[in-house]
């Protein structure tokens, strides 16, 4: 019975989500977004059926629908895997997309082609559902590329803006670099394992050295989840509309790389190299992104860098061989990250598209509900006890402090945790507190549509961590006893960050405006000089190409081209003229020579 209900619910979800996509364009003035977010709402209610059955029976189900390709040595089947990861994530993604689409009906109300915008968001969601429910790598790759192309279309939605076009191209290019690793893994498994089925890969991989495909998977996750070296596209992605940023950063594209490593983690847990790379890469990413967020003044860019920092923390959990903790943090992070972006969008919309936090302030009086939800989201991000982020973040840090694996990675992660509290409190202080520093606008009225939507996500940011912690079965026995200083390490560094953030925010108002920023400020504001380094290589390539073209055009081309021929003819003519050889014998000799050459050419080509 369960084997029938699971695929039927997935088919029903896709059918409901496809209805707004197949519906022809409506020219009426009615709210076209109602059908989109209502379809997602119904799909979310349907997804609760397999989630309830999964929590009740606690068993995985693999359903094969039909065979795509069948040869003597290689088969590709369309199959779906219904386990705790896929069923839980599908419900969370539908819930968050429902809230985001409802928010978009208010945020994008005055924009043309908003109906197409809702369809793009639905396709974005459907691609992610295909990715998380796939049971073979080829099917997973379809969802992988689906979220990639939809992110390109949505980030560049305002195609009249140069920054949006640049950001969309940047996202595609960096993700193509990550796709090289995925394709390398697909090719290796096709050559040596003769299968892309995930269950068969787990069985067959025990007899092979899986270092090469593991490195390929890490490269793929580095590109898609914006880890260090392939990260610059993620802060730029906030050039898209706020609903796009909320969906992309919370429950779709950026977590696809982490989910790929979670899904294929059994082939990595016995290898020492791959988890070590994940651990060090995640620690470096989380500290780097937190450092960059300290000096940013764009409200959306601060939230974007916090996403990159939390993705690094998820990568650390995978490096600790704790993929269930990484998935736990994906689920809790999705709620408060979507809420933070929607709160930021509501504030920007209310302040006439102002995004600089230095020009805000006093929103606690003008936007009390939005400000309260923003504060809850930031507290959940910091890991405040008993909010959603605390349960997952504290579990990862406890596993880190008791792992005895890498003191360097532990130190970087704890520093990044402290920096998270610093930039979170700085944002709350500059946006919500104090007196307004923006221009005087019309009376700001909090619309019930965005506040109700954000309130729904706020409840998730409060209780989701507790609920998921009771339903998730850990893959390893958790640490039950530890020294008190290790138990309190996460809370202590967070409190230290709050104190430091308060001190920095108060001192910033006393600093002379003419003070020249130092190297640490430029180091942070310029994203650790990565844009400079990434531009340096293309600039050198263009310069070398220009130099080569100039040399060829002005030297070799003219030497053997028009200038060379003209110089040769002039030399011959001058020689004939100077030596007075202009006689009938000379003319006859030249004439006969020309005829002989012509006959030889005709003989050669006939």
From Swiss-Prot:
EC primary class: translocase
GO cellular component: mitochondrial inner membrane; respiratory chain complex I
Key words, A-Z: Electron transport, Membrane, Mitochondrion, Mitochondrion inner membrane, NAD, Respiratory chain, Translocase, Transmembrane, Transmembrane helix, Transport, Ubiquinone
The keyword Secreted appears for this protein: no
InterPro entries hit by this protein: NADH_DH_su5_C, NADHpl_OxRdtase_5_subgr, ND/Mrp_TM, NU5C-like, Proton_antipo_N
GO biological processes: electron transport coupled proton transport; mitochondrial electron transport, NADH to ubiquinone; mitochondrial respiratory chain complex I assembly
EC number(s) per entry: 7.1.1.2
Localization, UniProt: Mitochondrion inner membrane
GO molecular function (one): NADH dehydrogenase (ubiquinone) activity
Swiss-Prot/TrEMBL catalytic activity: a ubiquinone + NADH + 5 H(+)(in) = a ubiquinol + NAD(+) + 4 H(+)(out)
Transmembrane segments: 2-22, 36-56, 89-109, 115-135, 140-160, 178-198, 212-234, 242-262, 273-293, 302-322, 328-348, 371-391, 405-425, 462-482, 488-508, 519-539, 556-576, 582-602
Translocase among keywords: yes
Membrane topology type: Multi-pass membrane protein
Description of how the protein assembles with itself and partners: Core subunit of respiratory chain NADH dehydrogenase (Complex I) which is composed of 45 different subunits.
Task performed by this protein: Core subunit of the mitochondrial membrane respiratory chain NADH dehydrogenase (Complex I) which catalyzes electron transfer from NADH through the respiratory chain, using ubiquinone as an electron acceptor. Essential for the catalytic activity and assembly of complex I.
Similarity comment: Belongs to the complex I subunit 5 family.
The protein's name in its UniProt record: NADH-ubiquinone oxidoreductase chain 5
Lineage summary: Eukaryota, Metazoa, Chordata, Craniata, Vertebrata
Gene name linked to the record: mt-nd5
